[in-house]
């Protein structure tokens, strides 16, 4: 595997470290051991309407992050950077794990993209997608958002936030080969991969430049030739918060903005899709009519397939990020889900909320402080009638959204945690709560792939209400319009000012 060769001595040191951690985790009073912090645990292990098919602990490294799946392989990024221990870099395995999933019951780590490409000091691989038609793995590397407090990361300010593109065709699937790098004009935070449903080979990435409050849109169609063209950078005119992320309609004409404390709004992104000179975005929802609530605010926004509703999720960390040190404050009761009626996108309205019991204020009144626990909604992937969402220490949740105004529980999966890992997440798993379901779920061939920050990659089968919807899916993820997304909500070519050639419009 490129960039990951280690000496026998280094491998022995790492095995010894994991073994020592396993022993320490069983001892009372040891920092980071289960039950040692005085915090209560969030949930017992449960599997309601989920069947565990396979699991990889990803070498017990901890600090796992983004997930991308293609063919017989899954790729798992890291929330932290590569730490130099002694004279060797990346002994905490902070690169991108390559996992063979040809047998979903036995996923196996077969390599890692490490130095000099990944797993560097001051670099985290927290966002990834696969452009399947081009067989390209897209890795968004973050440095500007690298912090000791949240990511156990060592910010130096010298590493740029870039997108790396890896060829994963043929033999490169198990040993990805870097072929191009794109350095955006603004530091990225998250991105949505959009493939033009009417122009084969055309792909855009919609980037939330959170620190700049901007939406940056870039044409990556020429990625294999190292060609990238920024179509526009729009300063979102919402007076508070920052653009954290956005969902994009299948036709690319609308964006559903998660603007942290600024809340939720709908935007027109047709300029970028039609590649107009001076392309920019425009708010369809006037800023004064946006839906907002107390911070930290909107983290993820996804439109429901075939329904005039948007699914909003917060992300809220533990009490260590509470007031007065942090504004807006984090902590109990953390974050949950809101269903927004967008039948009139100029005046969206809150239709319903969905919470776990731990997200009720009454729970906080009786619960001990949890400085490094988050029982918060995070990243969703939707089918027409289900929301599959990671909920940090609340595990992995299925929500029936067939009636968007009345979302109800459809299942939950909370595994037993690993005894020990190389690196606990300082903000999410350093206390007693050792489950941290984090990634966007990816559905491939009817099975669900999801990553826990601490405990690795899980492969699940959903067996609850609307199970046939999930089992029929070839590919679906919450942060692109790839695969079955187009089947669930076919785009209308006649909405473009210049419809594609051969289109017959009324």
Residue ranges, per PLM feature:
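Compositionally biased, low-complexity flexible segments
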Residues: 1-6
